[in-house]
Amino acid sequence: FYLMKLMKRFDNNIPSVLAAYNGGPHNVELWRERFAGVDDDEFVENIPFKETHGYVKRILRSYHYYKNNY
């Protein structure tokens, strides 16, 4: 349920949803404003919370692996 709310709030943008789940939706809104105009990869690289940055990278790496291999 919570992930569905985040998906709606962030227009199904997976990196933003993952970052919001781990680091809080308000923080993601601030980061998206700060890094407006950058692509998703650059957004992820600029996440200032070390834990959230690592979390998003790990989940996206797994997501792409399974998407490409299964």
Q: Over which residues does each language-model region extend?
A:
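Flexible, glycine-rich surface segments
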Residues: 1-14
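Catalytic and substrate-binding regions of cell-wall glycan-acting enzymes that process beta-1,4-linked
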Residues: 12-70
